[in-house]
Amino acid sequence: MALLHSARVLSGVASAFHPGLAAAASARASSWWAHVEMGPPDPILGVTEAYKRDTNSKKMNLGVGAYRDDNGKPYVLPSVRKAEAQIAAKGLDKEYLPIGGLAEFCRASAELALGENSEVVKSGRFVTVQTISGTGALRIGASFLQRFFKFSRDVFLPKPSWGNHTPIFRDAGMQLQSYRYYDPKTCGFDFTGALEDISKIPEQSVLLLHACAHNPTGVDPRPEQWKEIATVVKKRNLFAFFDMAYQGFASGDGDKDAWAVRHFIEQGINVCLCQSYAKNMGLYGERVGAFTVICKDADEAKRVESQLKILIRPMYSNPPIHGARIASTILTSPDLRKQWLQEVKGMADRIIGMRTQLVSNLKKEGSTHSWQHITDQIGMFCFTGLKPEQVERLTKEFSIYMTKDGRISVAGVTSGNVGYLAHAIHQVTK
């Protein structure tokens, strides 16, 4: 103890004669991370947190991006339960998957997106890797572009786009640009603006497209509009990067929802594609997705696959196994696949029905506004056209929670609360 006391005294004396030593000691005592600032809260998670604190029995959370049944409860698809039971009965091991994921899952995902009779699938001029849901697919795709797309660093996003698109591409080293997409005056697709902007994008740039059920607007191009977009993309030699998070969940028909992707490929446009099974199989927490690159030939596909594996290895080595087994079991079992397609249609139909009921109830309330855009839009989300101050009133006066831009998750609307929602919207818009 005496020696320790002497050391402290000597240290104090040294500090008195050498101020630099005192500063160094102070620096050592402070945290390495004192300079780290508090980051902004996630806007959607913030909505959910505020909702949870609300004690109003009529409160509604229309911010969450997950399907709910007509009782407002999370829904596990019966086909998923059956697939899990089949997997459990096999007593399979939990060994690592290959870097690219479960092979049969990757093949089935490509066939689901491109069509079982697709020339691309038959010729093998594609590569599909399993990813950590749609977000992981986007990040792998963005990193692949950053490393190998030598023509441009610019990625053109529709305005608006899913909020996570920007940080995903930005953090991968790409630069973000935008093109017109949503028309706030009509609450619909700004086809003229989009086509004009896309036609001016520098050649050999990356164009991000939502394959169906555009998030956050719910506004999709019609097939004839997709055809014109594809013509411009081909003429301008743009690289089409498709995000397809809602196949089957938009219209209830998986082939219809994948129409744009397949049309582009038929026109000789070699796209890349991100898929997610969060929404259409309800596998939110399993993180099941896929990333596909369409190539010139099978040889090129093998080279691309090798580089995708090199990208994946230092990120997460290999993807999780359970969710991929569930999806693969459903997609490759004729009976389960048929059941799943019916369940997906049931979810899509419920959302479409809620859109119709909301408009009907708004009319019953006596609203004189046009709400046709609610039924014209498609998928889980709806851009209501509500202004920020109206959204604020909905929250304060009616305990109805949504993002400030007026986007609602129609999956959070039920036959039990649609009347209340219509009444509240009418009160803040009349």
From Swiss-Prot:
<dbReference type="GO" id="GO:0016212">
    <property type="term" value="F:kynurenine-oxoglutarate transaminase activity"/>
</dbReference>
<feature type="modified residue" description="N6-succinyllysine; alternate">
    <location>
        <position position="404"/>
    </location>
</feature>
<protein>
    <recommendedName>
        <fullName>Aspartate aminotransferase, mitochondrial</fullName>
        <ecNumber>2.6.1.1</ecNumber>
        <ecNumber>2.6.1.7</ecNumber>
    </recommendedName>
</protein>
<feature type="modified residue" description="N6-acetyllysine; alternate">
    <location>
        <position position="73"/>
    </location>
</feature>
<keyword id="KW-0007">Acetylation</keyword>
<feature type="modified residue" description="N6-acetyllysine; alternate">
    <location>
        <position position="363"/>
    </location>
</feature>
<dbReference type="GO" id="GO:0030170">
    <property type="term" value="F:pyridoxal phosphate binding"/>
</dbReference>
<dbReference type="GO" id="GO:0005739">
    <property type="term" value="C:mitochondrion"/>
</dbReference>
<feature type="binding site">
    <location>
        <position position="215"/>
    </location>
    <ligand>
        <name>substrate</name>
    </ligand>
</feature>
<comment type="subunit">
    <text>Homodimer.</text>
</comment>
<dbReference type="GO" id="GO:0006536">
    <property type="term" value="P:glutamate metabolic process"/>
</dbReference>
<feature type="modified residue" description="N6-acetyllysine; alternate">
    <location>
        <position position="296"/>
    </location>
</feature>
<feature type="binding site">
    <location>
        <position position="162"/>
    </location>
    <ligand>
        <name>substrate</name>
    </ligand>
</feature>
<dbReference type="GO" id="GO:0005886">
    <property type="term" value="C:plasma membrane"/>
</dbReference>
<feature type="modified residue" description="N6-acetyllysine; alternate">
    <location>
        <position position="90"/>
    </location>
</feature>
<comment type="function">
    <text>Catalyzes the irreversible transamination of the L-tryptophan metabolite L-kynurenine to form kynurenic acid (KA). As a member of the malate-aspartate shuttle, it has a key role in the intracellular NAD(H) redox balance. Is important for metabolite exchange between mitochondria and cytosol, and for amino acid metabolism. Facilitates cellular uptake of long-chain free fatty acids.</text>
</comment>
<feature type="modified residue" description="N6-succinyllysine; alternate">
    <location>
        <position position="296"/>
    </location>
</feature>
<keyword id="KW-0808">Transferase</keyword>
<feature type="modified residue" description="N6-succinyllysine; alternate">
    <location>
        <position position="396"/>
    </location>
</feature>
<feature type="modified residue" description="N6-acetyllysine">
    <location>
        <position position="234"/>
    </location>
</feature>
<feature type="modified residue" description="Asymmetric dimethylarginine">
    <location>
        <position position="313"/>
    </location>
</feature>
<dbReference type="Pfam" id="PF00155">
    <property type="entry name" value="Aminotran_1_2"/>
</dbReference>
<feature type="binding site">
    <location>
        <position position="407"/>
    </location>
    <ligand>
        <name>substrate</name>
    </ligand>
</feature>
<comment type="similarity">
    <text>Belongs to the class-I pyridoxal-phosphate-dependent aminotransferase family.</text>
</comment>
<dbReference type="InterPro" id="IPR015422">
    <property type="entry name" value="PyrdxlP-dep_Trfase_small"/>
</dbReference>
<keyword id="KW-1003">Cell membrane</keyword>
<keyword id="KW-0944">Nitration</keyword>
<dbReference type="InterPro" id="IPR004838">
    <property type="entry name" value="NHTrfase_class1_PyrdxlP-BS"/>
</dbReference>
<feature type="modified residue" description="N6-succinyllysine; alternate">
    <location>
        <position position="73"/>
    </location>
</feature>
<dbReference type="GO" id="GO:0005759">
    <property type="term" value="C:mitochondrial matrix"/>
</dbReference>
<keyword id="KW-0032">Aminotransferase</keyword>
<feature type="modified residue" description="N6-acetyllysine">
    <location>
        <position position="302"/>
    </location>
</feature>
<keyword id="KW-0496">Mitochondrion</keyword>
<feature type="modified residue" description="Phosphothreonine">
    <location>
        <position position="48"/>
    </location>
</feature>
<feature type="modified residue" description="N6-succinyllysine; alternate">
    <location>
        <position position="90"/>
    </location>
</feature>
<dbReference type="InterPro" id="IPR015421">
    <property type="entry name" value="PyrdxlP-dep_Trfase_major"/>
</dbReference>
<feature type="modified residue" description="N6-succinyllysine; alternate">
    <location>
        <position position="159"/>
    </location>
</feature>
<feature type="modified residue" description="3'-nitrotyrosine; alternate">
    <location>
        <position position="96"/>
    </location>
</feature>
<feature type="modified residue" description="N6-acetyllysine">
    <location>
        <position position="345"/>
    </location>
</feature>
<feature type="modified residue" description="N6-acetyllysine">
    <location>
        <position position="59"/>
    </location>
</feature>
<feature type="modified residue" description="N6-acetyllysine; alternate">
    <location>
        <position position="159"/>
    </location>
</feature>
<feature type="modified residue" description="N6-acetyllysine; alternate">
    <location>
        <position position="309"/>
    </location>
</feature>
